[in-house]
Amino acid sequence: VCGGTQDNFSLCGPSGTSNTWGTRTSDWYIVNGGDGFQPIPDPVDHRYIYATSQTGGLTRFDRTTGRGQAIRPPAGGTLAAAQSGAAGGRGGGGGERVNWDAPYIISPHLNTRLYWGNNFLYKSDDRGASWARVSPDLTRNLDPREIPIMGKLWPPDAIAFRESTTDLSTIVSVDESPLIPGLLSV
């Protein structure tokens, strides 16, 4: 069983036990830091567990070594995965915007294929070691300073748009048809 916890990582542990004292805290292990979201175990190779943290951090956790590797796609559609830090910074730079809980999936057709979204969709066929941007900006690219709140436009210093809110105009979910490889819903 795996799950995310606010401010306290993503963790995995046993779904049950034959021990008379039940499952203990020591039975659980951390697979990713930060704010934990949805860890997804590789459905074929149980060695790997993928997990996300705030603002798009994506990690591949290796159960054999007990170590995680940051695999967040880099900004700008380049191929090498971001290797420094799990979160990789707000939005990833390069004009990219990322949701607080950025979506990702493991393809139901190929367990080494991952999809991850910010305002673009990225694909990896090698468990996140490299990425390719596979879409244009899929959002309306709304500027929060141009959206009325409570019936008016607010000055830049009235609301901390970049300090305490998630980016607007981001992908919030990704799914792939279980019947047709490559048919994606974003």
Per-range role (PLM):
Residues 1-186:
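Beta-propeller blade termini and top-face loops
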